[in-house]
UniProtKB/Swiss-Prot annotation:
Pfam families: 2OG-FeII_Oxy_3, PKHD_C. Keywords: Dioxygenase, Iron, Metal-binding, Oxidoreductase, Vitamin C. This is PKHD-type hydroxylase XF_0598. Fe cation binds at H96, D98, H163. It comes from Xylella fastidiosa (strain 9a5c). Its EC number is 1.14.11.-.
């Protein structure tokens, strides 16, 4: 399921992040991938140890927690803290697939934990007219989909998808990206639950008979109980 979720960040929030990232100390993005990825990855990335990365990442996680659509679509169990990248002129990232299992940050005294990447997320931090190229291109069974969204908007898609970032030919593209392990492993099941949840919310808003809504809500939770992993 490819889903555009608008206005995760307000215009003010997105602009503030842009300004702080403009003065950031970026490193070569190839340092974060293996030999295969390094052949096709040409961008900049905030270092893992950057205090700014943690600061902005926490702001994004807070914003995600305020989005009912994001929660309904992802049903998050674990989230890898947001990362940040920058594509300048001639930067690009060829077709690649995200790692299936990723290590979560370890807090002192805690047991190491990992995350299964079910959902890939890209949050755009500057507007499309600020750069040329730089489209996120996602390939699935229906073909290739080009994504280039306003600042503050989020795109989510299954982590099983091959994807790339087209060459930037003018300006600079800044984004945050992260992965989610969902309570529900299968993308088709998540899609069905989102459709059902959306229908329930619509019926509730139209004051449909309470018993009808209750029956549908019961079906939703029973499906979630059947499909979820905790």
């Amino acid at each position: 399921m490819l889903l555009h979720i608008p206005t995760i960040l307000s215009r003010t929030q997105a602009t503030s992040m842009q300004e702080r990232l403009a003065a950031a100390n970026w490193t070569d993005g190839r340092e974060t991938v293996g030999p295969q990825g390094a052949q096709v990855k040409h961008n900049l990335q905030l270092p893992e140890t950057s205090p700014l990365r943690q600061e902005l990442g926490n702001e994004i996680l807070d914003a995600l927690a305020r989005s009912p659509l994001y929660f309904a679509a992802t049903l998050p169990l674990r989230t890898l803290p947001p990362r940040f990248n920058c594509y300048q002129e001639n930067h690009q990232y060829g077709f690649h697939v995200d790692g299936a299992v990723m290590s979560l940050p370890i807090a002192p005294g805690h047991t190491p934990a990992s995350l299964r990447s079910d959902i890939s997320c890209t949050l755009f931090l500057n507007d499309p007219d600020e750069y040329e190229g730089g489209e996120l291109i996602i390939a699935d069974t229906y073909g290739e989909h080009e994504v280039k969204l306003p600042a503050g908007d989020l795109i989510i898609y299954p982590s099983t998808s091959l994807h790339r970032v087209a060459p930037v030919t003018r300006g600079m593209r800044i984004a945050s990206f992260f992965w989610v392990q969902s309570l529900v492993r299968q993308a088709t099941h998540r899609h069905q639950l989102l459709e059902l949840d959306t229908a329930i919310q619509s019926l509730t808003a139209s004051n449909t008979d309470h018993n009808t809504i209750l029956r549908l809500t019961n079906i939703y939770h029973n499906l979630l109980r059947e499909w979820s992993e905790t």
